[in-house]
């Protein structure tokens, strides 16, 4: 019997016949004869003494054949059979990531993306397609560029083609010096002659890195924003639902808006209701019955004044703090379905195909009439930072106007249905998004600085509203036939982040809270649903805001 730390186990009795066959190996095997198997261990101390004496000698190995399976008694010593790979039996089981570990993983991935982009450029394929991994590929190394915009040195590494007279396996693994020059230099005369125009053009380019105020490059910001919210979860249900009986199911109207004063205005039939985002109290501002009905609403950018468009073609200004009308402005001959503010200028679009610019401070309020649209104007949105106005109409046209000019700067006719949904990006200059109706079902993104279309997204349903997030580089779209859903999109990847469901009819109205944290959607199912989508970055205080109706405000 073999003795090991007080435990006994049976061993093979024919080990003495193979002692002279494997003298070169130095493995420890206790192969005693049958005469020694009768000996027993009386105490644990003798077992340790015999084990030390056995290790001081060199024992030959057992014959080279499969060892019989043994049932070892020591539960602390695993069976180390040669045919068993321990890593397959003792692999650590990875459980689901906790929220803390998930955030840490996302942060690590974003930081790695930032370092790659800043140190090695935006082409991630250079990390994988090295010359060693792919010897038959051509690798272009970006050349250092001076302030003059001229490539002083051109460095290109190429692998020469293999010859047909030699073994391809040998040549692919043998470094060969290129037959042409690696470095190219230009004489000062040729350099000045060929690059004078390029130098001036490059130095005047506003997109140069030295003119940027950001600590990172623009491509890095796009990469980080694209991966920041990748795969994040959206709420499955709204955190508040309000009944809205009498909410019109008309695609061409705009009956919902959330002001900077944290008041939500909604028009139900002929009445305008105000819901306080602070106290959740509901107030009836005014009832226009029986003389008129409400067709559009829009809060002033700063303050508590609300513009109301009516079916008769008039536009009224109301002070929501006192629920009193301050003035009435005429001009349209039919209903006013779209309103948009640019400081003290209120622009209105009507069913008479006209757009009116009104200065609310002047007695003679409207000073410009735009007549480029051929059918009803159903979408208006000012970009106050660049003084650009975007308008959409039932003539399937999207137009961009430079300030108060009478002719459009651009006129796009790519949509094949009415263009009501319009929104400007608050994060990039000149980026505009527009959505088409039932026959179109697309969201198109435009670069208004160049007058070109950037993206075309087929949503599969009617696009009723578009709204860009104030906090993140994302935009929200609401849809009618046939999905009746709310979608969140990432920019610039234009990938769908998620979908909000719950409405049972067309989601015709959309507004965002003043802090940019929540949105509210209104549908023809006569409900208002509140969704929390973003994290608030700052607190907005209505008491510190100046209004264009403030008498102490200067007239520009």
From Swiss-Prot:
Modified residues (Phosphothreonine): 98, 177
Annotated signal peptide: none
Effect after changing residue 62 to A: Increased mobility on Western blot
A Pfam entry, by short name: WD40_CDC20-Fz
Keyword Repeat among record annotations: yes
Disordered: annotated span: 1-80, 126-173
Record key words, sorted: Cell cycle, Nucleus, Phosphoprotein, Repeat, WD repeat
InterPro entries the record matches: Cdc20/Fizzy, WD40/YVTN_repeat-like_dom_sf, WD40_CDC20-Fz, WD40_repeat_CS, WD40_repeat_dom_sf, WD40_rpt
Annotated positions of the Phosphoserine modification: 62, 187, 214
Post-translation changes: Phosphorylated by cdc2-cdc13-CDK complex. This targets srw1 for proteolysis which in turn promotes cdc13 turnover. Dephosphorylated during G1 arrest.
GO CC terms: nucleus
WD repeats: 246-285, 289-328, 331-368, 372-411, 414-456, 458-499, 502-541
Effect ascribed to mutating residue 177 to A: Increased mobility on Western blot
Keyword Cell cycle: yes
GO MF annotations in UniProt: anaphase-promoting complex binding; ubiquitin ligase activator activity
Single GO biological process annotation from the record: anaphase-promoting complex-dependent catabolic process
Role, per record: Has a role in cell differentiation and cell cycling by negatively regulating cig2 and cdc12-associated cdc2. Down-regulates the level of cdc13, particularly in a nitrogen deprived environment. Regulator of cell cycle G1 phase progression. Prevents onset of mitosis during the pre-Start G1 period. Required for degradation of cdc13 mitotic cyclin B during G1 arrest but not during mitotic exit.
Descriptive protein name: WD repeat-containing protein srw1
